[in-house]
Amino acid sequence: MPPRTSLFTPVLLVGCFIIMVSFAVRASFGVFQIPIAAEFGWLRTEFSLAIAIQNLAWGVGQPIFGAIAEKIGDRKAIVIGAVLYAIGLVLSAGSTTPLEHQAYAWLVGFGIAGTGFGVILAVVGRAASDDNRSMSLAIATAAGSAGQVFGAPVAEWLLTMMSWQMVFMTFAAAIMAMLLTLPLMRAPVTANKAELEESMGQILVKAFRDPSFTLIFLGFFSCGYQLGFITAHFPAFVTELCGPILPGGVLHNIGITSTSALGAVAISLIGLANIVGTLTAGWAGKRFSKKYLLAGIY
């Protein structure tokens, strides 16, 4: 009988931590919509455009960082992503115009690409055994949802003690601090020399000729479209739609004392449900046909 390989390897644990921190920050941006717009008198559309640019940069950046990881190594790609992420947050903290905020959103978006699913899941998948791969990928994906669970409430809590600019600076420091765990992330390189020498154009042409890739691409597009809209606007929507939270009520008694805190908790609940769904999908993916399972989810 072959030796039983561990599910929770150092690569998986570090990968989960990096994704969790990265997505905690990303999921919190909707919390800042009202304070930033109120301070500078911006329109909601101006803030929304910055979030849209950030998501666009995240999408464009994922294949770029995938190529960087294959050329120079996963850990170096993650470092580049984290540095861009932190710089984008620091510059955004000093921005006073919508144009500046939108320009720096490109850096933040590319930073998310370098520290998010595209790079991390590839490393986790290579490091996992065949038996554990499906569950390892599910756990790493669920770590992103775990970041969403605490990211927005932490941002809202920090806003009660400091300005949104200082919260951005704090998040930038957290992004850089997570790099201290990188030495533990080592995974075998499986690409051969011919694959490494392929250009980005060749890889994209090959990918889009595969019907399975195209269907998965469209599925991710629909998922990302909805998720991006919810994380950007749902906290502000809840904050402005709900009436004041009265002392003695159920919400007040469990620590939710303002509508802005309720908006942050609403994002957390979505992330919590996502964790359950992701882990369930990972468990089911080991036992049932993945393509039919994915079709059923959509």
Regions found by a protein language model. Give the residues of each.
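Extracytoplasmic
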Residues: 10-44, 62-65, 229-236, 244
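Residue-level signature of mid-helix packing/kink "hotspots" within the transmembrane helices
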Residues: 27, 55-63, 148-149, 271-279
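Extracytoplasmic gate region of multi-pass secondary transporters
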Residues: 29-33, 211-281
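Helix-to-loop junctions at the C-terminal end of transmembrane segments
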Residues: 61-73, 277-289
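Structural signature of the two symmetry-related core transmembrane helices
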Residues: 76-90, 292-298
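Paired small-residue
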Residues: 88, 99-107
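Cytoplasmic helix-loop-helix junction between adjacent transmembrane helices
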Residues: 105-142
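Helix-loop-helix hairpin linking two adjacent transmembrane segments in secondary transporters
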Residues: 140-187
